[in-house]
Every structure is written in structure tokens, then in C-alpha cells.
Amino acid sequence: MSIIQARCIGNLTRRSIVNVMSRRFQSLGPNPQEVYTKISDTKDPKRDKFFQYSWGSWLKDNEKQRAKRTTRFSIEGATKLIANLIKEKSDGTVKSPISKNGSSILSHNILSKTIGNDTNVTIKSISSIHEGKHHRVYKISLSSDKQLVLRLPYRLESDVAISQKIKSEVATMDFLDLKLKLNVPKVLAYGPDRSNDLEHPFILMEYIEGDLLMKQWEPMSKDEETVKSVITPIADFHSKVISVEFNKFGSLYFDKDVASEHRLDAAYEGEENESLSGRWRIGPSVEKPFSKRKNKLSAKTVAQHNGPWKADEPLQLITSVTEIELENLKNRLALSQADAGSDLENQENLKKQITTFEHLKVMGPKLLNPKSKSIMNAEELFKPRLYVPDLDPMNAIINVNRDNEPYFLDFEYSTIKPFILSNYPPFVAYHGAKVYDLENDIPGYADMDEVEKQQYEFMFYKTRNERIWENDLNSRRHDLIAVASPHIKVLRSPYTQVLEYRNDQDYLYVEACIVQLQAMWEAYVANELCNSSDAKFPIEYSKEYLDKHTQALNQYQADIVSTPFAATDGWVPQDMFDQLLEQGILVEENGEYKVATEKVLKPEEGETQ
């Protein structure tokens, strides 16, 4: 009788994150719970907790949100998958992915160092080690004393979108590993949908042992070298990622995972390694706007907008992103007006969003001039290069088994696009007012109280960190440093703001990015920075429209500051949620939760108001 051990240690991961967010609500939490279950007993109720989301709760739609993040997979199927991998163990010769039972196996990565020397390897235990924003991560311990990582996506997007993202992410990791020789986990197998032994989409990769680079990240440190010690290895990785010039805009896939029309062209030129020639192709883009919040669009509709695009059409990406957002908003509005949608929609808000994206549709092709003589090395900046959106010390592990070298994780949403349209990594990007010298840039700084000083110090350190990133880029790719120009950042901001779209009020930020171009438009045209010869601003805003927009934006920002957990869309870390509920600070009403403001503001015993 086969029995497998399932160990859930989600609380340990959650505890460390809560510590970062709020020491006041830190909880020690229980010890990891070990559960033994028969492999054949798929309905064993003891398994349920192992699959359920436990990292946090939502103030609204809590049950619905948690259900989307349930990652029930076949434990019996996992044992079958491992058995199939053993049969494909190789000498490392690079071959095309092997399709078997709905999974794709990368046999060149099934080696003694990843799976062990035993010929009869079995699963010893499975542990839940992380519940992330988009995925649940399990660690599989094998009888050979090797460990693997099983990453399962939450069902937050359409099945087609999840499938494309998995196919593209694995191909991207394979490219970074084999072509660029970069430190990334080796993928052993992947399943893009539920028609595999696990009955769940998955990526199975090697386990990297070590601490996150984030443990060394001190963004407000006075010691610049301490900050550089984290930024520099990420900048090194980034410079190699952008080193290849591709033939199209889109995303990377294995040859077998794209439609026949996308298999006609090489992903890039000059490949001399026969085993890599034709291994990867460029297919539809998996950038966020083509999948996030697009569940109500058909796969056919999405496919009309998500590329790939020709290398000589660098601005088509902006147009396509705009068009799919418009398609989605108009579809939501039509469903709401026909009373056919499952969600209660704010029709007036949808109409306002549509207006903003109609403005962006006009502006998109005019934002940047690919042939500008005022943009240094414009031709290089508009060439197709790989963009990894989640370069971050949270996604880098210091590998204790390989000379403490950083290994990079999480290549979801990676895409090939013009370098000029790439954002800086979020951990160094700063969009606020720049402060380069506290004493000279801030009048009266020396006489300020500590609280006021801290506000300016925050701005100073954020400015410094972004400057370090730009200096690193300049030293490695001086030909691309024009992206650091404040004018380039402003001109591309309407598009990059769409990439950060989180909820239905964020259209206000997109509109604000368009509005701010108005003041400088004539100068941008005169200097050939934008792709227009008409000095007249393309959008005619009435004073009434701008006043209403400013008022709405100010109100939205005030709501974010004053509304508890607005910045996390109502998500609360579970330890904090449990304690707030116990203390009566959170109260339940009809299955929803709200903050009892009067209790929060009430002074504790011994305090005065």
C-alpha cells in the first residue's frame, strides 16, 4: 500500500512576510502539520487543507477569491510523472521537448544532479512552501535525496492564457539557460493545461537551496556599497537578457508550441549551435494586458490582438494593448447593459475607462519617434529585445550549492518588445520627485524635525537607487542609456501605466499620463521626440473634463491613503486578518468584512484623545 507524506508549511512562509508588513500583528503560528495519505485515496478529506489557499483573506468576495487559488492536483499523478521522468533520464544531450500524457518533458535536464542516481526513484514527501501572488509552490522530496519544485498557477485568468504563459515561461527559461548560460532553475517538465497526470497546469523544476537575495536588500541604507551589492548582480543578469536582438515582437515558445505560421521564421539570426537552431520561435505576446482581467473575452478575440508583430512595427504593441483594453471594456459594458454578466458593473465607470482608452488609441502611435535624431541610438532602442518584468531580489536565490551565485526565478509575462518601452525593475523604479542632495536640494533640511527629514530621505534614497541602476545600465549598454531620459519616460508613460492596471479606477492614472504630455507637446514635436509633425495636441480636452478628472484622481488617491488595505485591493495577510477579527477591529456583515473604524480610533486604557 503506497502512502505519501504531505507537509504543509505555508504558515512559516506567511509568518516571515507578515513580519515585514506589520510587527504589531505578528503571529508565531502553529508548527508544520504532517499528513499521511494513501496515494489511491483521491477523496481523502485530510488532503483538503493541503490544496486550500491560506496565506491571506479578502474583505470582499473572500470565498470566491480563495476558491480561485485552490490548487488541487493529483498526488497519484505526481508519482506517475516522476516515474515517467526516470524513463527519460539522459546524458544531457539537448533534444526537443518530449510529449507524454499531456506533459512535455525536457530530457536534457533529467540528470543525476537533478533527480538522483537511483533507477527506482519515488516521492518521499510533498511540502507546501509558498503561496504567492499568482502561484502555489510545493517542494517534492525524492527517495534519491534530491528535491524538486512543483509550481501550480492559480486560476486567475482564462485557461488559454494560463496555457500560453506556461509554454512561454518554460521556453524563456530554456533560452536563458541554453543560449545565454544564465543561472536559472532547470525545468524538467511542464503541463500547460489539465490534461496531464497531475490534472492541473504545472511547471516542475529543480529546487535551488539558499536564501533570497532580498535578505540583503536594504534600500534605505546610507552605505551605497550595500545597496550596490544587490543591484549589481541583477543588472549583470539584465544586461545579458537584453543582449540578443530578435526578429519579431511577441513572446518566446518552443517550436512545437506555436501555430504553423509562426514556425516559418527564426527567432533570431546567427545561431551556430545545431541543437539550438529552430528550437525557439516567437509567438503571441503574454504581456499582462493580454491576459489580466480578460476572462470574459474569447480566445479568438484575444488572438486578434496579441501578436506577434513585425520588427519594423515597434509601436504596434501600444496600439494592440490599447485595442484589447477597449475590446474588453466594451464587452463588459455590453454584458452589463444586457444584464448578462455575473458581476455587478459600474456602467458609468466603464464608459469613462472607454473614453480614456479612446484617447490612448489616438496617442499611442504618436508617443515616440522610431527615427528620431534627437534620441541617441534610436534604432537600437526600438529593436526587439527580451523583457523580464519581475527582476527583483525577491526572485533571486543565493545558491549555497553553487558558490553562492544568484539564481533567478519567475519569468512569467516575459515578452519581446522595443527596449524603449521597458520599465525599470519595480524594486529600483521611482516615479516621484527626485532628490539628489539633501542639503543642497531641500531648503531648510538641516532644521527640519525627524519625521519631515525622513520623508525627504525616502525620496533621496529612492532617487539614489534608481540612479545606481541607470549607472549600471550605462556602463554595460551605453548605447541604450537614452531610456533614462526624463522626456522618454514621460512619453512612454501612458503605455507603461497600462501595464500596472490593477482595478477600474486606475484609468485615472492612464489619463493623467496623457494629460501631462499636453504642456510639452509642442517642444516634443519640434525636437522630433514624438511621432508627429503636428504641434497641436491630438486630444482636445475641455476645462470641465480636466477639472472633473483632477477631482476624481485626487479623491481616488485620498481613498487609497485613508481606506484600510485599499493598496492591496482588500487582501489582508492571514495572521493579521485572524487577529483583527479576534480583536473586533474587523467585523463580518453578510459574508463581507469591514474595519470597525470607531474601535481603531478609540484610545486604549490609560491613553488620552
Curated annotation (Swiss-Prot):
InterPro entries: Aminoglycoside_PTrfase (IPR002575), Kinase-like_dom_sf (IPR011009), Mito_inheritance_9 (IPR051035). It is found in: Mitochondrion. One of its GO terms (cellular component) is mitochondrion. The keyword Hydrolase does not apply. Residues 1-24 form a transit peptide. The keyword Mitochondrion applies. Keywords: Mitochondrion, Transit peptide. Belongs to the AIM9 family. PANTHER family: ALTERED INHERITANCE OF MITOCHONDRIA PROTEIN 9, MITOCHONDRIAL. This is Altered inheritance of mitochondria protein 9, mitochondrial.
